[in-house]
């Protein structure tokens, strides 16, 4: 039980996919200008990452490995992710049309979010079992969500602040992301 908790904490804080592995930077920078959009994207990405991680494990274990189709791993994982994203988009559109409009193009772009594919591939490379795959996917999603929401809140405050002209927009966002990354480095010794 404790190894599962350590895996979760390690994935969320120590080995954060955005700040340490630099995966998922497109939605991190693109959706983080408004807190409402960031929260919606976080919920959608959490659902997609967790479900895609579990389904990718099942596809690998019960389809690719028994038939010696390891060379189709990346293609099959992309297909699994695309199906999960389409399901999520239909779910969001039916439950919250305003959130669907707010997320706009970023919801279908979860398919191309390298963090989602990265989690699926890292699960296989690190030889995680079913439970570890689910925890790893959920932890990566929670870490992504945590960073996205914190970054979004900071960007909203920076939009109202008196930022020097050369630093407005993307420049101050990159400086802020760098400072967040430094703050998360403080968790480095937490989990081995």
From Swiss-Prot:
A Pfam cross-reference name: Rnf-Nqr
Function statement: Part of a membrane-bound complex that couples electron transfer with translocation of ions across the membrane.
Transmembrane segments: 5-25, 39-59, 65-85, 102-122, 134-154, 171-191
Alphabetical list of InterPro entries matching this protein: Ion_transpt_RnfA/RsxA (IPR011293), NqrDE/RnfAE (IPR003667), NqrDE/RnfAE_oxidrdctase (IPR050133)
GO BP of this protein: electron transport chain
HAMAP family: RsxA_RnfA
Protein source organism: Shewanella pealeana (strain ATCC 700345 / ANG-SQ1)
UniProt-recorded name of the protein: Ion-translocating oxidoreductase complex subunit A
Record GO cellular component, one term: plasma membrane
Name of the encoding gene: rnfA
Annotated family: Belongs to the NqrDE/RnfAE family.
Primary subcellular site in the record, as a coarse category: membrane
Localisation per UniProt entry: Cell inner membrane
